[in-house]
From Swiss-Prot:
The active site is at residue 132. Residues 626-701 form the BRCT domain. Pfam families: BRCT, DNA_ligase_aden, DNA_ligase_OB, DNA_ligase_ZBD, HHH_2. Keywords: DNA damage, DNA repair, DNA replication, Ligase, Magnesium, Manganese, Metal-binding, NAD, Zinc. GO terms for molecular function: DNA ligase (NAD+) activity; metal ion binding. This is DNA ligase. It comes from Malacoplasma penetrans (strain HF-2) (Mycoplasma penetrans). DNA ligase that catalyzes the formation of phosphodiester linkages between 5'-phosphoryl and 3'-hydroxyl groups in double-stranded DNA using NAD as a coenzyme and as the energy source for the reaction. It is essential for DNA replication and repair of damaged DNA. The gene is ligA.
Length: 701
């Protein structure tokens, strides 16, 4: 199986006859997608483009479908990406805010259309086509005609309450004529004009990379006065409980919203069939640059709500809608220089410095170059004109150099021989293309390791940025991650520590100034975040240790099996290899890591400062009743709506009964859990197969 990017760049070849290679590829895709989700939603600073993310997700879904034995309920293909900040009150969505599956070409659209026809057994249906706005998803609630709450999508299950900030949007009415409970969903964004105005503000300490980041930062600002000045816009496109309005079609819902003076897009069209959809997509693709705001695709929905339950849902996507994604834009610019950096594992990275260029709404001047072999194989030289495409909101990727535009000024970039941080000799490991710094005392490596320990997937110490960690380490206030837990006793030192900053002047020069690394409030916030991390479950600490091959997913599996760091440290390779998501390389890496006296000392110190070493099961206190023992190790399917979200019910069933939850009814299904407005097709199939139906909310007992 080949994967080709932009029909130019072959990424890898996968031997489809080798199950181990397939599993490794699936695990790598899951790991990468989890990281990309964190970067996009949590950091708002993605390292890959939407297109590249979508390609990874599409490949993962294909492999999981083709090899169901490697499927997992915890795969990122089953989850809605998102992130919940600690700054705002958390609110649980009554109905989860799901994402959409993607289409990338006409073939994908025709397959989507064919799947709909099969699901409803007819071609008598139509579509609604809507621009996909590149903004921040929002849920707004009205009660008695008054706007009472606004919540971001968050992770799809829980979002952030931004009610005060949403009220600053001038086009959104605070009162409507409809006097019953109403929830509407849409997108908050900035027009291109308003984005340019914000970024041209001389008082802005750091420019936003693009309009989406600016909209997100503005809506989630703690000061509503600042939000009001940003002139946010919003358009709405969905009513989760539209049937309560006695409306049966999506296009009619949009007309109803318009009558309530709730803003909707004027580019929405009703199409009688898939050919009409394809024609409309072609029109929007040609005119997308003329929009007053950024759009990153087109949403296609089945118009008639009566078909929705019949068509069904996955745990992540509704099957009655799809998002067509625009192909990535390729542009040319000049490569001026290449920076060499080192990461936490010692791997050497290459960042290209470019002539600044506008690419898909962002000003970009840097690009990633993978590794030195990539530079050499693609014959990329300094001063080349290169083709780049969007590989992130800040960092794009270089596809190739344009040799016919060379003017004689080009220079070969030499392969580095020494670490850019510590000057140690670089080494290329067996069967790897990357160069590594093996010096354990390398300053930059150690800083990156502490940053990884603090990251969301690991100990999740909010507010502890890489710049703060760097200052703490370089000022010898900390020597490793465990030293973070001693900072509470060093308040005077921390507040006295100065950090250098540089401000760019109008004439291109820079002015240096200093300010304290911490003030009283920021010190208190950091210490509270550090203290809070002590009570994390075992898998978070295990992930943060940065043991080779052990990411969060593997750490979870190991934690469930061994229950404590102490038990894992005493486990043999054979015992470790019996755990799902592990293997020979991981077991060897773990045993070697726990055998190292230096690491044993680190664990002793971690225990001493109070870091939790035990696995915490949130369902540990649940006692399974006798009448529910039959659910143990069985396969369930869920249909309809309940007093809890499907993901909550799914998590409960999997954790309490060690059971599997599937998306579709088959001969392997043991139980069908049925809620309100359940789909007729699943019920019919379950009855035909004589599968037991459950209607009681046993998770409440």
């Amino acid at each position: 199986m080949f994967v080709i990017l932009h029909n130019k760049l072959i990424i890898y070849y996968l031997d489809m006859s080798n199950n181990k290679e397939i599993l490794n590829r699936i695990q790598n895709l899951r790991k990468n997608l989890n990281q990309y989700n964190y970067e996009y939603y949590g950091l708002e600073n993605p390292s890959v483009s939407d297109y590249e993310y979508d390609m990874c997700l599409k490949e993962l879904i294909q492999l999981e479908t083709q090899y169901p034995e490697f499927d997992s309920p915890n795969s990122p293909s089953k989850k809605v990406g998102g992130y919940i900040s600690e700054k705002f009150n958390k609110v649980k969505h009554e109905i989860p805010m799901m994402s959409l599956s993607n289409a990338f070409d006409e073939e994908d659209l025709l397959k989507f259309d064919n799947d709909i026809k099969k699901a409803i057994g007819s071609s008598d249906f139509s579509y609604v086509v809507e621009p996909k706005i590149d903004g921040l998803s929002i849920s707004v609630k009205y009660k008695d005609g008054n706007l009472i709450q606004a919540v971001t999508r968050g992770d799809g299950e829980i979002g952030e309450d931004v009610t005060q900030n949403i009220k600053t949007i001038k086009s959104l009415p605070l009162n409507i004529e409809y006097d019953k409970d109403l929830e509407i969903r849409g997108e908050v964004f900035l027009t291109k004009k308003d984005f340019e105005k914000i970024n041209s503000d001389p008082n802005l300490t750091k420019k936003f990379a693009n309009a989406r980041n600016a909209a997100s930062g503005s809506l989630r600002n703690l000061d509503s006065n600042i939000t009001a000045k940003r002139n946010l816009s919003a358009l709405f496109y969905y009513v989760p409980k539209a049937t309560e309005l006695k409306i049966a079609k999506q296009y009619d819902v949009l007309s109803w919203l318009d009558k309530q003076l709730i803003p909707i897009s004027r580019e929405i069209r009703h199409c009688n069939n898939i050919q009409g959809v394809i024609e409309r997509i072609s029109e929007l693709t040609d005119t997308r640059d003329q929009f007053k705001y950024d759009i990153d695709g087109i949403v296609i929905k089945v118009n008639d709500f009566n078909h929705y339950e019949e068509i069904g849902y996955t745990s992540k996507f509704p099957k009655w809608a799809i998002a067509y994604k625009f192909p990535a834009v390729v542009k040319q610019t000049k490569l001026n220089s290449i920076d060499v950096t080192v990461g936490r594992t010692g791997r050497i990275n290459y960042i290209a410095n470019l002539d600044e260029i506008l690419l898909e709404g962002s000003q970009v001047k840097k690009a990633t170059l993978h590794n030195y072999d990539y530079i050499k194989d693609h014959e990329i030289m300094l001063n080349d004109i290169v083709e780049i495409y969007k590989a992130g909101e800040i960092i794009p990727k270089i596809i190739r150099s344009i040799k016919e535009k060379r003017d004689g000024s080009q220079v070969v970039f030499p392969e580095p021989t020494n670490c850019p941080s510590c000057d140690s000799k670089l080494v290329k490991k067996e069967q790897e293309v990357d160069l590594y710094c093996l010096n354990e005392n390398c300053v930059e490596k150690q800083i990156q390791q502490i940053e990884y320990f603090s990251s969301r997937d690991a100990m999740n110490i909010e507010g502890l940025s890489i710049s703060i960690i760097s200052q703490l380490f370089r000022n010898k206030i900390i020597n490793d991650a465990i030293d973070l837990y001693e900072l509470a006793h060093k308040k005077e030192i921390l507040i006295a520590t100065k950090q250098k900053f540089y401000r760019k002047n109008d004439d291109g020069t820079k002015t240096e100034f200093e300010r304290s690394l911490f003030k009283d409030k920021s010190f208190t916030n950091i210490i509270e975040a550090i203290e809070k991390s002590k009570s994390n479950s075992m898998e978070k600490f295990l992930t943060g240790l940065g043991i080779k091959y052990v990411g969060l997913r593997a750490a979870k599996a190991l934690s469930k099996r061994f229950k404590s760091i102490e038990e894992l440290a005493m486990a043999t390779r054979e015992e470790i290899e019996q755990v799902p998501d592990t293997g020979e390389k991981m077991s060897e890496s773990l045993v070697n890591w726990f055998s190292d006296p230096k690491n044993q000392d680190l664990l002793w110190r971690a225990k001493k400062v109070g870091i939790n070493f035990n696995y915490i099961n949130e369902f540990n206190d649940v006692v399974v009743k006798n009448e529910h023992q039959k659910y143990m190790n069985k396969t369930f399917v869920i249909t309809g709506s309940f007093n809890k979200s499907r993901n909550e019910i799914k998590n409960y069933i999997e954790s309490v009964f060690n059971a599997k939850v599937s998306d579709s009814v088959s001969k392997k299904t043991d139980y069908l859990v049925v809620g309100e407005n359940a789909g007729d097709s699943k019920l019919k199939k379950a009855n035909d197969l004589k599968i037991e139906i459950i209607t009681e909310p046993f998770w409440d007992n």
